[in-house]
Amino acid sequence: MARKTKLEDYRNIGIMAHIDAGKTTTTERILFYTGVSHKIGEVHDGAATMDWMEQEQERGITITSAATTCFWKDKRINIIDTPGHVDFTIEVERSLRVLDGAVTVFDSVAGVEPQSETVWRQADKYRVPRMCFVNKMDRMGANFYRCVDMIVTRLGAVPLVTQLPIGSEAEFEGLIDLLKMQEIVWKDESLGAEFEYRDIRPELKEQADEYHAKMVELAVEMDDAVMEAYLEGNEPDEATLKKLIRKGTISRKFVPVLCGSAFKNKGVQPMLDAVVDFLPSPLEVERMQGIDPKTEEPDTRGASDDEPLSVLAFKIMNDPFVGSLTFCRIYSGVMTTGTGVLNSTKDNRERIGRMLQMHANHREDIKEAYAGDIVAVAGLKNTTTGDTLCDPLKPIILERMEFPEPVIEVAVEPKTKADQEKMGIALNRLAQEDPSFRVSVDQESGQTVIKGMGELHLDILVDRMRREFKVDANVGAPQVAYRETLTKRAEIDYTHKKQTGGSGQFARVKIVFEPGEPGSGFQFESKIVGGSVPKEYIPGVQKGVESVKDSGPLAGFPMIDFKATLMDGAYHDVDSSVMAFEIASRAAFREGAQQAGVKLLEPIMKVEVVTPEEYMGDVIGDLNSRRGQISGTEQRGIAQVIHANVPLANMFGYVNTLRSMSQGRAQYTMQFDHYEQVPQAVSDEVRAKLA
């Protein structure tokens, strides 16, 4: 089976936006006009094709990124739907990894919102070329020009305006195409499928000329020869302009800005044209960086069917009909059903069973997938999010994704005995799909604890457990994920001896325990020379410390940011074993922790509140009362932005306080920043609660 679409005709794009900016509606319209869905699904009725999980339909927010493929002007567009809520930024990051370009959707009334900035910064991190679509031009208070200003002031980007709106709010009837210098006006009765080009009306001519000139001036900077000709009075034609805008977009010198109203079916087709004209094909983005697992040397893969196979698994979903589906982006080579591949991240083999190409609501079985494709593979046993699949003879590990640590936890208990077993299965499935979600069982109380990125994140996971797996559970109040660490250095020399007829147990270890840098986690080093502890026993020493560090001596929280160095030891030819060294290092750690002293750490969140000026004093006062430290304030348009670091323990239920304090006008976002020592009074309180 040969490749159907040339690689240069692929566009792998994501649609990024703040909640409610109209991302799902925009995606729906794209699928409608590219001929995939026959009836437009409205998010308002909860029937959009992209939002295929029941919950998303109820909450009207998009949670899982479904990958959909469609065609426009003979180009294949693969759309990865990204979630827009801050609790799901991990999914956004993951989808940004596999995109080549993105369309950022803004609400023309709200402009650039906090979450849009978060997502924009993530897209900068992965160097994703993007364009902007200013949506909802038909709403009261729509203001395209203010939105363009905010792209400069809030995102620090350079907007290249390629369209102007004709009218706004109820008067919004179409756009001026600044490349063709013509109006595009839609016929209402044809659901936006029909539109016509007309001459620009006289009253808008002056403004159109002004913006056209600005656009040309920015575009010609991409090519010296065109620039010279332009300065001599020769204006570039439309085809040349498109080439220059494409070049500037892909090199991230500027972002094309378009406008429309997806809900009113206006502006979607020109946006699709812009995706094809300005966003890169897999051939135009940087080669994928990776590491050769055999040599640990850097290696790369380019978009070509002839290079060795390299594939990134970026999402796992459970499908009621097919079971577990792993969404994959093929960077190089060809993947065929029935063949074996290497999961280089975990160093084990996988067999490619069934491959599916996902359309908005149906799926098509395929036998081969080529470089640039995004496919879903059924039945992979050990592959999780972020793993690389590759040619076993030419292995590569594509750059690893970094997942933030979960900071909030709740205890969940099944309501009935029957739910008990189902809950275990459900939680494991969910943890497999979402690396920012962890499940653990408290050894002492036997309680199951789930950990995630925020209150909404955990709400949704519990909800999915109920719907998808039919598990009813009681959920405790959210708890803070405290940690413990050492306060100073301690050196422990410990000997473990046990003699009971026959062979006994013997191990002696001398270990230095010391505090590490913040964020360093747990480090283990062996400085054994001359074999005072044989090589094969050293992993036992490390394992011993690891087995007890998850339950600290102070209040039973995991210990972080410390280092254990094995300095010396002794063994016995008959009585020593890995087990004996494990027991010795465990006891040494307990003694060391006691001697070094242990302190309690709490997660500090980076909080950003955007509020109208008049509530600023109240907001700052309230943050201070939550043990918050204000790190700065800035003016953003008419609003004030307050940056603060606040302990997570004091942020529960903050959203309600903020709403009532600002009459619903202020919003906030928060993400984990670092761990910090807890004040003594709070530490005593936490320990008393646990006791």
UniProtKB/Swiss-Prot annotation:
The keyword Transcription regulation does not apply. Gene3D superfamilies: 3.30.230.10, 3.30.70.240, Elongation Factor G (Translational Gtpase), domain 3, P-loop containing nucleotide triphosphate hydrolases, Translation factors. SUPFAM superfamilies: EF-G C-terminal domain-like, P-loop containing nucleoside triphosphate hydrolases, Ribosomal protein S5 domain 2-like, Translation proteins. Its main location: cytoplasm. One of its GO terms (molecular function) is GTPase activity. It is found in: Cytoplasm. The keyword Protein biosynthesis applies. Pfam families: EF-G_D2, EFG_C, EFG_III, EFG_IV, GTP_EFTU. Keywords: Cytoplasm, Elongation factor, GTP-binding, Nucleotide-binding, Protein biosynthesis. PROSITE patterns: G_TR_1, G_TR_2. One of its GO terms (cellular component) is cytoplasm. GTP binds at residues 17-24, 81-85, 135-138. InterPro entries: EF-G-like_DII (IPR053905), EFG_II (IPR041095), EFG_III (IPR009022), EFG_III/V (IPR035647), EFG_IV (IPR047872), EFG_V (IPR035649), EFG_V-like (IPR000640), G_TR_CS (IPR031157). GO terms for biological process: ribosome disassembly. Residues 8-283 form the tr-type G domain. Belongs to the TRAFAC class translation factor GTPase superfamily. Classic translation factor GTPase family. EF-G/EF-2 subfamily. PANTHER family: RIBOSOME-RELEASING FACTOR 2, MITOCHONDRIAL (PTHR43261:SF1), TRANSLATION ELONGATION FACTOR G-RELATED (PTHR43261). Catalyzes the GTP-dependent ribosomal translocation step during translation elongation. During this step, the ribosome changes from the pre-translocational (PRE) to the post-translocational (POST) state as the newly formed A-site-bound peptidyl-tRNA and P-site-bound deacylated tRNA move to the P and E sites, respectively. Catalyzes the coordinated movement of the two tRNA molecules, the mRNA and conformational changes in the ribosome. This is Elongation factor G. The lineage of its organism: Bacteria, Pseudomonadati, Pseudomonadota, Alphaproteobacteria, Hyphomicrobiales. The gene is fusA.
